[in-house]
Regions:
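Hydrophobic helical membrane-anchoring modules
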Residues: 1-5, 17, 27-28, 146, ...
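Residue-level recognition of beta-strand->loop/alpha-helix junctions
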Residues: 41-43, 68-70, 121, 195-197
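Conserved donor nucleotide-binding strand/loop of the catalytic core
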Residues: 37, 51-84
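Conserved beta-strand segments of alpha/beta enzyme cores
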Residues: 38, 63-65, 148, 190-192
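Donor nucleotide-sugar binding loop of glycosyltransferases
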Residues: 15-19, 46
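Hydrophobic targeting segments
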Residues: 4-10, 19, 26, 37-42
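Acceptor/aglycone-binding surface of glycosyltransferases and processive sugar-polymer synthases
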Residues: 69-72, 76-84, 89-92, 100-174, ...
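A conserved acidic beta->alpha catalytic loop
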Residues: 43-52, 97
Length: 231
């Protein structure tokens, strides 16, 4: 069986009120860009009807698969979804913030440049505190990992399946994006960023707060130490 051109992983957390509409809007976009495609929906520690909604989507679309995780975590959901993908071009994104237009743009770049890692670079934040917190985090990661990017957490992220190290990420938390970008830098995977001008949420509430932000600042240092072999 020929593998699909594009595999897209969508972590889902308490998004029962809008995930069906989001996924339905992605289907024609991926079909137009890649032809054959697959979507892997990963519900994680949901307290609403997201698993049932995703199961219904999978029943209605042969291109969609779903996986329900008892434990939560952005990284855990991304990793579990990546493990199920079979496509030539693999990607993941924040389904609460990614419009069909943004997805189409990043996916088209990934298909046009099959040896490149493609990621979004979000140019707008919700408010000044998020902008400032993001700036601090990105400055920290740039210094720790010698990175050129200004938006570590920006999604969509797409990469060729041949870059297999990106299919074996280790973080179960929000640090998975820093791990992704740092690994690209260390392995010499070429990366291009696509400016994204919209960050409105389809629905739901961001789980980022001051506590989680501080955890990410500390976690970036721990990630650097682990990637250096524990030094």
């Amino acid at each position: 069986m020929t593998p699909p051109a594009i595999s897209l992983v969508l972590p889902v957390y308490n998004q029962a009120d809008h995930i069906a509409g989001v996924v339905e809007s992605y289907v024609p976009v991926l079909r137009r860009v890649g032809g054959e495609f697959e979507i892997v929906l990963v519900t994680n520690a949901c307290r609403d009807a997201s698993p049932e909604v995703c199961a219904q989507l999978a029943a209605e679309h042969p291109e969609i698969r779903t996986l329900d995780l008892v434990q939560g975590g952005w990284g855990r959901a991304v990793r579990a979804g990546l493990a199920l993908t079979t496509g030539e071009t693999v990607g993941y994104t924040n389904s609460a913030r990614t419009t069909p237009e943004i997805l189409a743009l990043c996916a088209a770049y990934a298909r046009a440049y099959p040896d490149m890692v493609i990621k979004a670079n979000r140019r707008i934040r919700d408010n000044w505190s998020r902008r400032f917190g993001s700036l601090l985090y990105n400055l920290e990661c740039r210094a720790l990992f010698d990175l050129p990017t200004w938006d570590i957490n920006g999604t969509p992220k797409f990469f060729p399946r041949a870059y297999s190290d990106l299919l074996a990420l280790q973080r179960d938390d929000d640090l998975i994006d820093a791990e992704f970008v740092a690994l690209c830098r260390r392995r010499g995977y070429p990366m291009a960023e696509v400016p994204v001008l919209s960050t409105r949420r389809h629905g739901g509430t961001s789980t980022t707060n001051y506590g989680s932000a501080l955890k990410m600042y500390r976690g970036a240092v721990e990630l650097r130490r682990r990637m250096d072999g524990g030094r």
